[in-house]
């Protein structure tokens, strides 16, 4: 299988085609470090010049900044790209007649947005919250229609003991109904979830007719539980998948002995050992581990595209090289024979 970043693939039943490689925009919001307007523009242009025509954003990214940046770039292009953004968080502030709920405890793994806009996020998965989020994203992006909406970070990973409250807002409170109405009216082409846990997508399929979902970090060379437990269900229900987090927080893109982070924390010994064995086999076949990590999810028929998040034009170009690297079938056969993939 030889991949091209610009290759167009059908996105389930949405009628959309997305490039096999998509660009996530979270870093443009100042994730981990500030990003200037000039650097953000250069990064987006490099993605476009590389043939990428699928871009993902969210109100959360830079508290609205990323949607502004992305819309400003795409509105100037002669060719229409596919855009996905998210619902579930509103960007707001206190004002006369409105008092916001207390801010949730800060996640110690969240370094914040270093040059985001001066807003505060408030979770709202209800009918009115979803509709307002859609309206706000239309204005920030500058497009009257948005191709895809993902319900952002619903689930226990984000909400812990508040999960049931937010789940009820999404289900009984009309969040899914709002998304269904937007799809029926042609305001969006499809919707699904954008999350870090496949189990909540499985649960959501019992509540709504999802078209496409974004799953981060849960289908990779180091985590394949979803391949047996979830991907067949996605195929059966006709729901396409976009996979993000293919490097599992960096360990699969780092050189041997380099960064040892897995799922935003220090990698446990068994993950380090598995990664070292992957390095051994990659060296044998002269394949960069990062290239294998990027291409692996697309070997499954349920997956339409993968998303990358980068901080510079150089990183985009390097990712495209990895993505388009020729990998022999024997390499994958060896991984399978050693139980590293199924």
Swiss-Prot record:
- SUPFAM superfamilies on file: NAD(P)-linked oxidoreductase (SSF51430)
- Please state how the activity of this protein depends on pH: Optimum pH is 8.0 with pyridoxal as substrate (9.5 with L-fucose as substrate).
Describe, from the UniProt record, how activity changes with temperature: Optimum temperature is 30 degrees Celsius.
Which residue positions are annotated as catalytic?
A: 56, 61 (proton donor), 86
Q: In which pathway does it act?
A: Cofactor degradation; B6 vitamer degradation; 4-pyridoxate from pyridoxal: step 1/2
Recorded GO molecular functions are: pyridoxal 4-dehydrogenase activity
Protein's recorded name: Pyridoxal 4-dehydrogenase
Please tell me the species this chain comes from. Microbacterium luteolum
**Primary gene name:** pld1
